[in-house]
Amino acid sequence: FPYTGIEDRTEDCAGAWDPENNANRALRAIREAVPDMVLMTDVALDTYNINGHDGFVEDGIIVNDRTVEALVKMALAQADAGADIIGPSDMMDGRIAAIRAGLEGARHSDVMIMSYAAKYASAFYGPFRDAVGASGALTGDKKTYQMDYANSNEAIRLIERDLREGADMVMVKPGMPYLDICHRVKSSFGAPTFAYQVSGEYSMVKAAAQNGWIDEDRVMMESLMGFKRAGCDGVLTYFAPAVARLMNG
């Protein structure tokens, strides 16, 4: 996820597919330094959009099809830069099929897609939006394209669609408040299922530990075990370095 200041954001989001943007330069540098590392990238326009949304906005409405065309260009630029896994987190309709077709056409058939198929309009994203410079840019909210947190059946429908369109694996986001969704997804489809322990979840644990209310390491491991118990094959978490240190002694 690149940090993009307001001064570098535009209405046409052209920076998203610029081969020299921060994300693509980082991909090439990491690929050169650590050739065997698996690299995953985020595909959405929010970090390049002047209004902070994941798609183009016209007259206050997110324009789906025009956004999908841009997302394909963004995904191809990332694949060219060395990405192994493309992670569309935008929640536009039809973007998985379009990205898969684009990758195949550009001879990137080995690049995998992890679809953020069940991404909820959540209050847990706050610290992340601050970190990537999106909070000040965002106009309105994302409830017209991210999912209602009261709805569970829609997640199953969207995941079925994205797998049919060519996703290799799926993501549930946020994580801990949606363990029921993780379990349903894995039980229903058997596909590789991941959860994103988002910035708000991470920050709550860190803040409580800093105040002496909980044991950070124990709560961290317990929370991650909850994902595994729910059926997740992997977890994206900001605790990753700490977990690695703890598990490796």
Q: What label would you give each PLM region?
A:
Residues 1-249:
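Alpha/beta enzyme core
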